[in-house]
Amino acid sequence: MGDARESVFVVGNIGTAYTSKSLEMREDSVTVAEISSFQLETIEQFRPKVSAILNITEDHLNRHHTMEEYIRVKELITKNQGPEDVCVLNYEDEVLRKFGENIVPKVVYFSSLRKLDQGIYLDGDQIILKTEKEEIPIVKTGELKILGRHNHENVMAAAAMAYYAGVSVESIHKSVCEFVAVPHRIEYVTEKNGVAYYNDSKGTNPDAAIKGIQAMNRPTLLIGGGYDKESSYDEWIESFDGKVRYLVLIGQTKEKIKAAAERLGFTDIILCEDLKEAVQNL
């Protein structure tokens, strides 16, 4: 968006408060905002021209208590949208696919697993945007600098949002080709003695952490643990699937994760007091 428009603000749950930039915004400014479920709980007039929900996975149950309530709050992002607005949704998420059948804004689905009659999808190594009138090649996955199928899905969602916000295909292609991993999201750090180090500390729920494991293409020593959001760790541990050789655990959840891993037959586990000790044990 920043390549195509003069006045763009990136704000919200990424770390820059919306209110901190509000006085700098002009009539023609564009705001790109990451909105958390916590923020959506209390919206009144918030109305995005283009919204998106990338997936619905178990998270923040320490606040929302049930998945049903978490889903209800996430879906509030379309509360004030009209028929001229757009909502981008993940077709492969059953909850979102059904949600898209009964909302007011125009729905644009994305999928990395199948071609869509309309929407944006992965066809071989090519990301295609199919509108009512045409098929538009966006980018080949080999041109991207970010790893993993989930990042292909992120590119699809971002490209669809930008397109329906009025950004040209040329600008979209240029931006997605130049984009590198954001800090703490499968971020390459360095390679030492044949070991590549990645920082995926933004993977703060099991689904996000699974995406990080799936993006690795060599045997992995994994540091995990942290604040307890009352999530289940079974699916995350099952995703190790022979790829994770050792699990180094820290934080509030280390004993809980250790118990879950051992119950599922994974026993190559080291418990540490903090991140520094964990890195020293690699």
Which residue stretches match the model-derived regions?
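C-terminal helical cap/extension that packs against the catalytic core
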Residues: 234-282
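Nucleotide phosphate-binding/pyrophosphate-handling subdomain across enzymes
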Residues: 141-245
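Residue-level signal for inorganic ion chemistry
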Residues: 13, 34, 54, 70, ...
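Short internal beta-strands
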Residues: 87-91, 223-224, 243-252
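Short, structured coil segments at secondary-structure junctions
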Residues: 47, 102-104, 216, 243, ...
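Flexible active-site lid/hinge loop adjacent to a nucleotide/diphosphate
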Residues: 24-116, 121-123, 128, 135, ...
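Walker A (P-loop) phosphate-binding motif
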Residues: 1-12
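Beta-strand->loop->alpha-helix junctions that form or flank phosphate-binding loops
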Residues: 11, 104-122, 173-177, 187, ...
